[in-house]
Amino acid sequence: DPFDSRLDDELERARLRRVFSQGLDHAVGYLLPLQATGHEGARWSSGPWFFRDERMYLVPGDSPMGYRLPLDSLPWVSPAEYPHTLAQDPFAPARDLPHAAVLRAQYASHARFTRYDPHTAGHGFAEGGTVSLQTAEPARFASAHWITRTGLCVEVRDPARANGPEVEMGEHTHSGVLYVFMPPLSHLDDYLDLLAAVEATAEELGVQIVLEGYGPPRDARLKLLQVTPDPGVIEVNIHPAHDWPEVVEHTEFLYQAAFESRLSAEKFMTDGRHTGTGGGNHVVLGGATPADSPFLRKPELLASLVLYWHNHPSLSYLFSGLFIGPTSQAPRVDEARNDQIYELEIALREIQRNRQIHGQDMPPWLVDRTLRNILIDVTGNTHRSEFCIDKLYSPDSSTGRLGLLELRAFEMPPHERMSIVQQLLLRALVARFWIEPYSAPATRWGTELHDRFMMHHWVRQDFDDVLTELGDSGFHFDPAWFAPHFEFRFPKVGEVQVDGMTLTLRNALEPWHVMGEEGAIGGTVRYVDSSLERIEVQVSGINPSRHSVTVNGQSLPLQPTGVAGIWVASVRYKAWNPPSALHPSIGVHAPLTFDIVDTWMKRSLGGCQYHVAHPGGRNYDTFPVNAYEAESRRLARFFRMGHTPGRMAGVQPTLGVPASREFPFTLDLR
C-alpha cells in the first residue's frame, strides 16, 4: 500500500532503505523462461519474453524475484488458451520414479547438448537436446498462446537480511548466496528432471545454492517433510509411515531433533502449571495412495470413529489442550449446534443406505458430501473440527482428494512415548472398526458434557470403558500406559486428611468462550474469556448425612461416584479479572478456602487453601526456568491449613445440598 509506508516499524524502514538504495538500473537476477511440454521428445520449452521497452522491470518490493515477475506485461493470450498449471488427479495411475543415478547421468557434462535454431517457431523442436525453443513473435491482436509464461529465476541475495536490520547493517561479512526459484509444475517427473539439471549445474560450477519458489507437486510417490514457523511454535509435518516401527522411529526422531535444537514440546506457565506448547499433535490417517484410503474403501469406518468419539467424551478431552469448547480449534460434533446430533444420525444412516445400494463401488464423493456440513464448528468452518475431512475427497480441488482424515483434538504431549501410545490407541480403534463397524445409538450428553466430563474422575471412568472394549476385541492396553496423560491433563493440586477423611484437589477442564466483537485500532477483535478456572474436589470417608464440604462458605454439591465412600464435584470460579470478560462486574473468588464441616457440631474439622497467585503477593514477571522452579511455584499456592475458624451454622449435610439443574456436578461461585 503506497499510502501506508509503516515507517514506525524498524523492519519496514530497512526494507525501504534496501529497495531505494539499489536503484532501477540494478540487475536483480536472471530469468530462464521454462515450461514443461508434457509430451515425448523435448520435455521442456523456452523462448524469449517480449516487452514494450525491451526491459523487464520487476514488481517493486524485496520478495524473491519469482514472485515479482511482470507476467501481465507479456503479450496477450485469450482466456481459453491460457496455459494454466493444473494439479494432477491423485487417483491417476503413476509409474515408478526414475532412479537418481539415471537423472544425474542425463545431465552429465558430456551428455548436455542443445542446438539453437533461430528459425524455429511455434512448437518446433531443436535437434539433439531436450528443450524446444519457441521464437515466434506475436502478431498484433493475436493470442500469443505459445509464449512460455513460467521460468526459472536465479538471483544473489544476502541471507543476513533475514536476521533483522541490526545484523544487516552491522559489521558482518556481506556474502551473497545463490537462490534458485523453482517454477510451478504439474508433474513430479518434470520437477525431478529440472532439479537434476540444477544440481548438475551447481556441482559443475562448484557453487552452493538455496532452492525457493514453488514446491514439488503433491504426489504419493514423494516423501515430504515440511517445517513451518507458527506463532510460538514450529509446525512439522512428517511424511507418512507405512508400519508401526516407522511410526515409532519418526516420533522419536522428531523429539530428539527438537531437543538437540534446544526446542521442547512443553512449557510452564507463569504460575508454574505444566502445559503443552499449544501446538497440535494432529494425526493424519489414510492410505499409501488416495485409492487405498480405508475411509474411501470402507466409509463405515469413518462413521464408526465419529460416532465412537461422540459416545466417549474422554477421547475428546484427555488429549486436547487448554482451549476447548465450541469455539476451540477442534470442537466436538455436539458442541456446534443443539440439533447437530440429530443431523449426524441422519448422515450416518445415509452412509449405511448408500453402502447397501452401491456396495464396494460407492462413489467417494458421497462420503464427503454426507459429512461435510456435519463436521464443522459453530461458524461452519470445516477445518476447525475434531474430525477434519478437508483432504478426504473434496471435489473442489485435487489437493482435497487425498483420502486423508485429520484428527485435530490432540495437543503435543511433552514426551515421545506419550505421543506413541496415543497413535497406538488410534491404530487399535481403526483396526477394530475395520473388522466390526460401530453401530451404537448416539448419546445425548447435553450439559453433562461441560459438567461431568470436565473432571478427572469421570474422564478416567469413561476412558477405562474404552480400554475395556478394546480388550474385548483383542486389543489389550495397560491402563498404566495412560497414567502420564491423566496426571498431565489433570494435575494434582494438593491433599489434606482430617479425622480419617481425605480431601483431594485437582485441576479440572474449563471451556473458554469467545466474546463479542470489540472495536480496536484498525478493525475489530474478539477476545477469549480465559478468566474462569475449575477445580475438582474428591472426598472420601465422609458420612453424607453428617459431613459437608464448603468452598468459601458455600456447600459443594458432592455426587456419588459408584465407589463406596467416594464423592466428587467441581468448583468453577473466576481466577482473575481481565478487561474483557463475560461478567465484568463479578470479582475474583481467590483464594479458595475448603472446609470439611461437621453439621452436627456446626464447625469446621479442617481444610485447606488454594491460591491462584503467590499468597505473599509476589508477582512473577518471568517464566520458570525449569521443572523444579515450576513445582515450587505450584506448591507455594496450596496450604494444608487456613480452614474457617469458629461456628459454621446453616450448612446442609451432603445429602441435603441442592444442585444446579443444568450443572449438577459443579458449584459455580459466580
Regions found by a protein language model. Give the residues of each.
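C-terminal accessory/tail domains of diverse enzymes
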Residues: D1-I209, G215-G232, H239-T277, A288-R670
